[in-house]
Swiss-Prot record:
Name of this protein: Small ribosomal subunit protein uS10
HAMAP family per UniProt: Ribosomal_uS10
UniProt keyword terms in alphabetical order: Ribonucleoprotein, Ribosomal protein
Pfam families: Ribosomal_S10
An example Gene Ontology molecular-function term: structural constituent of ribosome
Subunit structure: Part of the 30S ribosomal subunit.
Amino acid sequence: MAGQKIRIRLKAYDHEVVDSSARKIVETVTRTGAQVAGPVPLPTEINRFCVIRSPHKYKDSREHFEMRTHKRLIDIIDPTPKTVDSLMRLDLPAGVDIEIKL
């Protein structure tokens, strides 16, 4: 797999879960002998919602909610077959969304 690059994007609502998952991936990749660039923190996506508290009237009384999506980017340069195999077997938490591009 010479000259290839694997790009991994992690997304989660909890920043601690994303950081621990990124740490696990980096440790696994360095143990198998490939080079790692990252984890690079990407901008946090914030979705804000404004909701009227009352179901009927009192429009002046509103409540604000927000959802934060934390993202990290990891590049694996020149992965070995052992690296790919160990990444496939890696057990990560359920709250993390993982995108892998070759």
